[in-house]
Amino acid sequence: MMDGTHAIKRSRSRSPKVSQSKSSKKKKRSSSRCRSGSDSPARKHSTLAKYRAEVPDRRKKERRKKRRKRTVSTTSSSSSESSSSSSSSSSDDSGDSTCKSKRSSHRKKKNKKQIKRKKAKKNKKLKKKTSFKLECQDTKSTEKEVLPGPSVNPCKKESPEVSGPALTDEQKSRIQAMKPMTKEEWDAQQSVIRKVVDPETGRIRLIKGDGEVLEEIVSKDRHKEINKHATQKDGLEFQMHSGMF
């Protein structure tokens, strides 16, 4: 039995169709190898030419991509910078607005305080004026109550009444001296110049007003005698002081 099966297999494997197919495949492979061996340098040359032609195109494309990336990066950076600058400007504007609002509020508070102070000062002044007016009115009313009659000047003194005989010139002069005088009367009295004779020396003096001595009128002989007496007195005083006499 075993021998029969092996024989069948061998017969099947050695069938003419199978052997033809195998031979055709081998021929195709050998032909393809021959063609590839004969055509390999031409193909290699064409592939190198294609690669060399494609290299600059690829480089150009890569450069374009890099440029695009750069432009995109620059635009993104510029946009980020603009956004940052806008944010900083907005923050600055907000800070300025807050500072301005604070300053305005501070000024308003100051103005309110100043207005209040001015009003308080005015009220104080008005109160003082009203109180002073009331005090003046009160004093006037009290004076009227105390002095209902005619007003009496304390400076004007009544002349003393003398009963008996008539007054002498000395008494009259004393009474006049006791009376107050006006400025005009005083000037008139002081402008009067009188001549007075001294009985002891015999000099004539010009006296203005109450006692101002203007000039002494003396004769020549009397003037010489006065000078002699003056020199003698001066010499005696000098000797007394020096211890000579």
Curated annotation (Swiss-Prot):
Biased composition (Low complexity): 72-98
Any Gene Ontology CC annotation: nucleolus
Biased composition (Basic residues): 23-32, 60-71, 100-131
Compartment list: Nucleus, Nucleolus; Nucleus speckle
Family: Belongs to the ARL6IP4 family.
InterPro entries in UniProt: Nucl_RNA-splicing_assoc_SR-25 (IPR019532)
Region (Disordered), start-end ranges: 1-171
Keyword Transport: no
UniProt keyword Nucleus, yes or no: yes
Biased composition (Basic and acidic residues): 135-146
Annotated keywords: mRNA processing, mRNA splicing, Nucleus
Function: May be involved in modulating alternative pre-mRNA splicing.
A GO BP entry: mRNA processing
Protein name: ADP-ribosylation factor-like protein 6-interacting protein 4
